[in-house]
């Protein structure tokens, strides 16, 4: 009787349902509410309560249907409209959620929760203008709602409204001056703007308010990494993990120790990161990079494999693993791996770094694509320094050469004499040494050749770019490109009005802020210009500079001392092991099988590379003893004397010899090369063309093999070519550094004049 009495009174019925819910008698409550719906069809409160029960039990669709039923009874219920918005948000039906939030706001424009939840959706949908308006409405309703200021600031920063973003952070600080999170987030904004000293100031303020502040300590550490102040970075990163473990802090500590060559500490922190998050691929990949750098390639491959099991699409992982395998001549699944990388590049995925792409493919279009993908991901144009000023035209053009290899390095050997011969009446020379190099004879020569030699190894990228601007460098010449020790971020900020890619990296950078690449017509014919993001400064002869006189020691080298039989024909390849492909190696082994008294001579590769090459040789039916491996000479003058023991140098494909080709040709050893299309392939062909030795350039694998056989079986022809080579080396303009210097200076002047005539960069033919 009591229940019947209750069911005749809507208020008593509703109270009873609430009582049952509070006593966890949910089923009884639902039964009463459903009965009440029938008895009181115009009373929407029962339907609303049923809807809430459904939503709280995650029966979202039932809840939505009940709320809609309630609106049929009374459409002017702002809270029901709001609840429908929440339900559709939970169901990820975002447009429907917005529709009901907007309807609710019409009836109840002061309900701040409507706009807070709508902001969540607009952020997901990346509808930034509407999102900004939404945050402004929240601030109107509650001027002290901090998240509306800080979240809006982040959006304004992302769309380039930096000053507006900064103003919002300052307002947030006025409202809550003792909130450490605001200072920390403000520091992040300055960090993103590369205003590092201001970032440090705000991180320190955050720590002053809250000393137990691991996030601010970590962020401070990362700022000091950017500033290349590694000891300070280590100190702050270690403070960030005093009371809690942090994956990012561990990986960054490991990366710093790796950069400082503290190998034991680097591995300790990579392993800590892996232990903390074994399901994350990042630490495995970074550990593999470190192991690569210390030549523990087998361990690097294992770390890459661990990362692959977690995330096959981790950026650059697949390409770097293949590069590591190639460096030890492990060619298992080589063709499949190459095919996969090609496919992923065409899908514009970050699958291989540019240098590896050059090693994998003789296709300048694919190389350009790989470089563009990499630049967009790693080093996009950075406008944090603002547009560069147009300097007045001066009598002397200020050239800035940027390199991490001003020391005992092949690039330095090639350009030292060029630096010395630059016309100081026309040019003022600045060197920016971007990585630490030990003192050496070559570095001393280079330092003397410049008007200013500036060691910026410990400067941040922004500081280097600013310094170049302060010095009013007219032309910045990047001698690194996409190679080790390069600092592409410097050029992404525009270090100079004219920026040039030269020598260190044999290919396009893919960067829209690099204006020119220096080359020659042989390497980049007109029909391949579209494969380069830069315009081309064409030198009239070979693009590669060379020393006029190379040092050759008087030390006597004999075949016997190198383990080479006296009476055999010596094929050799002194390229890096990662340039050797299974395809080219098969040709070399066929040569050994056809030329009975012959050997293949290599430099001192790693023990793993030697083992794998011997195994491949055995598989192909040739005695592994016919592969001879010599130690690498510490002094280049000894190297130049030693390589004369070879009869023929066999070039690799698709990534061919460059300075190595020059070394062997100067030593009187003919170089057989297989011409392709890419920059990294054609340098040897360009050198040979300029030496008037185009007969050493082959256009097919068959021609390559046949020419090698001809030399090995026709000693008179070999003698004739060697005599021609030695004569041409002495007579060729290839080794006339003064003539080369005049040509490259002509290219610089033309690029400079175009700029001051307000003309866009265009292809230039140096004189």
What residues fall within each predicted segment?
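Short Ser/Thr-rich beta->loop micro-motif in glycosyltransferases that lines
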Residues: 480, 651-657, 675
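Donor-sugar nucleotide-binding helix/loop cap in glycosyltransferases
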Residues: 650, 664
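Alpha-helical solenoid repeat scaffolds of the TPR/TPR-like class and their adjacent stem/linker regions
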Residues: 1-564, 576, 586, 615-622, ...
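Short, well-ordered beta-strand segments
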Residues: 398-400, 572, 601, 672
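Substrate-binding clefts and catalytic carboxylate motifs of secreted carbohydrate-active enzymes
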Residues: 572-583
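Glycine-rich phosphate-binding loop and adjacent beta-alpha segment
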Residues: 674-675, 680-683
């Amino acid at each position: 009787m009591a229940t019947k009495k209750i069911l005749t009174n809507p208020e008593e019925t509703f109270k009873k349902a609430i009582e049952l819910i509070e006593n966890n008698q949910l089923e009884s409550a639902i039964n009463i509410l459903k009965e009440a719906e029938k008895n009181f069809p115009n009373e929407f409160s029962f339907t609303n309560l049923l809807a809430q029960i459904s939503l709280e039990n995650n029966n979202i669709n039932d809840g939505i249907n009940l709320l809609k039923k309630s609106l049929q009874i009374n459409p002017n219920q702002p809270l029901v409209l709001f609840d429908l918005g929440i339900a559709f948000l939970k169901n990820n039906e975002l447009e429907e959620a917005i529709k009901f939030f907007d309807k609710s706001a019409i009836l109840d424009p002061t309900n701040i929760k409507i706009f807070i939840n709508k902001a969540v959706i607009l952020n997901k949908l990346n509808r930034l203008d509407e999102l900004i308006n939404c945050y402004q409405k929240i601030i109107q309703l509650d001027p002290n709602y901090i998240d509306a200021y800080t979240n809006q600031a982040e959006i304004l920063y992302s769309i380039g409204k930096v000053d507006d973003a900064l103003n919002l952070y300052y307002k947030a600080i006025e409202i809550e001056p003792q909130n450490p999170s605001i200072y920390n987030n403000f520091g992040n904004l300055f960090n993103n703007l590369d205003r590092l000293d201001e970032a440090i100031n705000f991180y320190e303020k955050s720590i002053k308010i809250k000393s137990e502040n691991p996030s601010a300590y970590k962020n401070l550490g990362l700022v000091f990494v950017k500033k290349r102040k590694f000891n300070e970075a280590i100190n702050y990163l270690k403070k960030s993990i005093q009371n809690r473990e942090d994956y990012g802090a561990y990986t960054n500590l490991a990366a710093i120790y790796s950069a400082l060559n503290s190998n034991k500490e680097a591995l300790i922190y990579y392993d800590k990161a892996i232990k903390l998050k074994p399901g994350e691929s990042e630490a495995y990949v970074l550990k593999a990079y470190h192991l690569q750098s210390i030549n523990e390639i087998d361990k690097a491959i294992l770390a890459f494999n661990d990362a692959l099991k977690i995330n096959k699409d981790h950026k650059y992982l697949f390409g770097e693993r293949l590069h590591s395998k190639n460096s030890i001549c492990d060619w298992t699944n080589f063709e499949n791996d190459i095919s996969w990388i090609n496919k992923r590049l065409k899908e514009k995925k970050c699958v291989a770094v540019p240098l590896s792409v050059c090693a994998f493919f003789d296709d300048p279009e694919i190389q350009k694509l790989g470089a563009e993908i990499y630049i967009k991901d790693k080093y996009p144009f950075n406008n944090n320094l603002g547009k560069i000023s147009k300097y007045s035209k001066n009598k002397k053009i200020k050239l800035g050469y940027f390199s991490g290899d001003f020391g005992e390095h092949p690039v330095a050997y090639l350009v030292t004499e060029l630096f010395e011969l630059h016309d100081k009446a026309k040019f003022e020379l600045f060197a920016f040494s971007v990585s630490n190099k030990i003192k050496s004879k070559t570095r001393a020569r280079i330092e003397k050749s410049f008007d200013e030699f500036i060691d910026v190894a410990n400067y941040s990228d922004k500081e280097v770019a600013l310094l170049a601007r302060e010095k009013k460098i007219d032309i910045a010449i990047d001698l690194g490109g996409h190679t080790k020790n390069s600092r592409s971020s410097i050029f992404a900020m525009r270090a100079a009005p004219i920026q040039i890619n030269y020598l260190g990296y044999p290919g396009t950078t893919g960067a829209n802020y690099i204006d020119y690449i220096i080359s020659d017509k042989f390497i980049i014919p007109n029909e391949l210009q579209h494969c380069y993001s830069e315009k081309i400064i064409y030198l009239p002869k070979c693009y590669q500079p060379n020393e006029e006189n190379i040092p050759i020691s008087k030390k006597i080298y004999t075949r016997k001392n190198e383990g080479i039989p006296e009476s055999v024909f010596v094929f050799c390849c002194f390229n890096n092991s990662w340039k050797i492909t299974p395809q080219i190696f098969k040709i070399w082994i066929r040569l050994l099988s056809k030329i009975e008294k012959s050997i293949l001579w290599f430099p001192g590769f790693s023990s793993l590379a030697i083992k794998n090459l011997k195994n491949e040789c055995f598989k192909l039916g040739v005695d592994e003893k016919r592969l001879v491996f010599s130690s690498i000479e510490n002094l280049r003058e000894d190297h130049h004397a030693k390589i004369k023991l070879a009869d023929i140098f066999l070039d690799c494909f698709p990534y061919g010899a460059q300075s190595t080709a020059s070394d062997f040709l100067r030593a009187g050893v003919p170089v057989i090369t297989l011409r392709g299309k890419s920059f990294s392939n054609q340098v040897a062909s360009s050198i040979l063309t300029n030496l008037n030795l185009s007969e050493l350039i082959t256009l097919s694998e068959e021609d390559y093999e046949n020419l090698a056989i001809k030399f090995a079986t026709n000693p008179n022809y070999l003698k004739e070519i060697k005599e021609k080579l030695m004569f041409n080396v002495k007579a060729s303009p290839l080794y006339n550094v003064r003539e080369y210097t005049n040509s490259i200076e002509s290219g610089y002047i033309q690029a400079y004049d175009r700029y001051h005539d307000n003309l866009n960069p265009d292809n230039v033919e140096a004189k």
